[in-house]
């Protein structure tokens, strides 16, 4: 009689395992996340960005300047704003950013990572899958290779003369 109860438990466990799936939620990133403040830090090359997202109407403040003043390039503006556009949250958050170090491209990449991490902190369940799939939560670890002794640059060697 005890054997029969164990068999029924095994069958139930097998049914539970077949219902489990590792696929991401198709509804992720549909813009239904909670509207609350969030904070994230992003780094790229030598740039470090500290990003705070607060509920608002979509204003950007980067080191006390607007997004258009700080990044005149539309390409960099699009890169910085891409996590918010992906989650369809345009006009729902104001971004206050402090960024230093590096050049414009490195700073834009650092801000993008900071914004993505802030959105992830705001609503992990709704936002994480879409942000991760788009690659916004991955830190770009590429940095400038150091110059080596005896070479002109990191890999550029002096011209070779056979005779």
From Swiss-Prot:
The keyword Ribosomal protein applies. One of its GO terms (molecular function) is structural constituent of ribosome. The keyword Amino-acid biosynthesis does not apply. One of its GO terms (biological process) is translation. Keywords: Ribonucleoprotein, Ribosomal protein. It comes from the Bacteria. One of its GO terms (cellular component) is cytoplasm. Gene3D superfamilies: 3.30.230.10. Residues 1-11 have a biased composition (Polar residues). It holds the Pfam family Ribosomal_S9. Signal peptide: none annotated. Residues 1-40 are annotated as: Disordered. Residues 18-27 have a biased composition (Low complexity). PROSITE patterns: RIBOSOMAL_S9. HAMAP family: Ribosomal_uS9_B. Belongs to the universal ribosomal protein uS9 family. This is Small ribosomal subunit protein uS9. It comes from Bifidobacterium longum (strain NCC 2705). The gene is rpsI.
């Amino acid at each position: 009689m005890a054997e029969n109860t164990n068999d029924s438990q095994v069958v139930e466990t097998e049914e539970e395992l077949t219902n489990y799936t590792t696929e991401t939620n198709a509804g992720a990133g549909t813009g239904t996340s909670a509207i609350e403040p969030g904070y994230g830090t992003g780094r790229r090359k030598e740039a470090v960005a500290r990003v705070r997202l607060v509920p608002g109407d979509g204003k950007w403040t980067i080191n006390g300047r607007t997004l258009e003043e700080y990044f005149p390039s539309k390409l960099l503006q699009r890169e910085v704003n891409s996590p918010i556009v992906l989650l369809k949250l345009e006009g729902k958050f104001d971004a206050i950013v402090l960024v230093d170090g590096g050049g414009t491209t490195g700073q834009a990449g650092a801000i993008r990572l900071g914004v993505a991490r802030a959105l992830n902190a705001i609503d992990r369940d709704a936002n994480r899958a879409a942000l991760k799939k788009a690659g916004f939560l991955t830190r770009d670890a590429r940095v400038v290779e150091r110059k080596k002794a005896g070479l002109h640059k990191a890999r550029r060697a002096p011209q070779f003369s056979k005779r």
